[in-house]
Design a protein with these regions (language model features):
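A small/polar (G/S/T-enriched), proline-flanked helix-loop surface module common
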Residues: 23-207
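C-terminal motif of bacterial Sec signal peptides marking the signal peptidase cleavage site
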Residues: 15-18
Length: 207
């Protein structure tokens, strides 16, 4: 429980640091703000801006078997939603199942789906002082992110049709031995790739 909450908290700090202050208010989705078709799912939270709705919900749309195959326990799911007047993030965090004695106690993973665009995410990450490596994943623009002020953590932001999917992972050490920065992100791209494959299927059937 501690690792999951810590992972979610640290990711939220990193994501929200580059965003303007807000009232943290949300529109109640019991009354949809705009008419929707019978095939459109209204997000659990919506904001008051004219941004796109957050279509992909990590808490609802990532199958348990995908999380398990990636090395995370779906039973440890913990909500990490955030709604402001001007943007929305839907997400959850999970405890990892991989344990390497003397090296890795476990991983903590957070997945947030947001409706600010890729360039806003890039600017936010730069403003946070992140070390950014632009890359691509499954044909999508992506950013690999580390930050010396958040040791043993690694992030990846992937462009979506409505905004970005933001991943944050923390390596909880199983000893006091330091972990070289070059190893902070080992294996994260594989995890992200598995979930982005789910996103690909979701977006292809939602058009």
């Amino acid at each position: 429980m501690t690792s999951r909450r810590t992972a979610g908290a640290l990711l939220a700090v990193g994501v929200l640091a580059g965003c303007a202050p807000s009232t943290h208010s949300a529109v109640i989705t019991g009354e949809p703000p705009t008419p929707v078709t019978t095939t459109t799912r209204v997000p659990r939270l919506v904001d008051e801006s004219d941004r796109p709705l957050v279509a992909f919900d990590p808490c609802l749309d990532i199958p348990d078997d995908v999380l398990t195959a990636a090395g995370y326990d779906p039973r440890t799911e913990d909500n990490a939603d955030f709604a402001a007047t001007h943007f929305t993030m839907l997400g959850c965090s999970y405890d990892g199942t991989l344990h390497i004695p003397g090296v890795l106690a476990n991983y903590g993973l957070s997945v947030l789906s947001a409706n600010f665009d890729f360039e806003e995410e890039r600017q936010k990450a730069t403003g946070n002082g992140d070390d950014i490596v632009p890359t691509q994943l499954a044909g999508r623009r992506a950013l690999l992110k580390t930050n010396s002020s958040l040791p043993y953590s690694c992030g990846m932001s992937v462009e979506t049709s409505y905004g970005v999917l933001i991943f944050g992972r923390i390596h909880f050490r199983d000893s006091s031995a330091p972990l070289p920065k070059l190893q902070w992100c080992v294996g994260l791209e594989d995890t992200v790739g598995r979930i982005v494959a789910v996103l690909d299927d979701f977006e292809s059937t939602s058009r």
